[in-house]
Amino acid sequence: LTPNDPLYSQQWGLSGTYGIRANTAWDNGYQGQGKIIAVVDTGITDHPDLLANRTSPLGYDFI
């Protein structure tokens, strides 16, 4: 997979020293079909609309 985003080189979270090395996954054939990914930050632990829909214990890191 070749990223077509003109700002890809600035997205350190994908490919930089501290990134997830997405290009390595893409080179190995992982492209994300059939996967749902969410990044959820602070502020959800006591949000009334989300309390009933949490599927993991607080503080759990999926990665």
UniProtKB/Swiss-Prot annotation:
Compartment(s): Secreted
Enzyme Commission numbers on file: 3.4.21.-
Peptidase S8 domain boundaries: 11-63
An example Gene Ontology biological process: proteolysis
GO CC term (a single one): extracellular region
Listed Gene3D superfamilies: Peptidase S8/S53 domain (3.40.50.200)
GO MF entries: serine-type endopeptidase activity
Top EC class for this record: hydrolase
Keyword annotations: Hydrolase, Protease, Secreted, Serine protease
Predominant cellular place of this UniProt entry's protein: secreted
Quaternary structure (record): Heterodimer of a large and a small chain.
Family indicated by similarity: Belongs to the peptidase S8 family.
Protein name: Protease 2 small chain
Lineage, highest ranks first: Bacteria, Pseudomonadati, Pseudomonadota, Betaproteobacteria, Burkholderiales
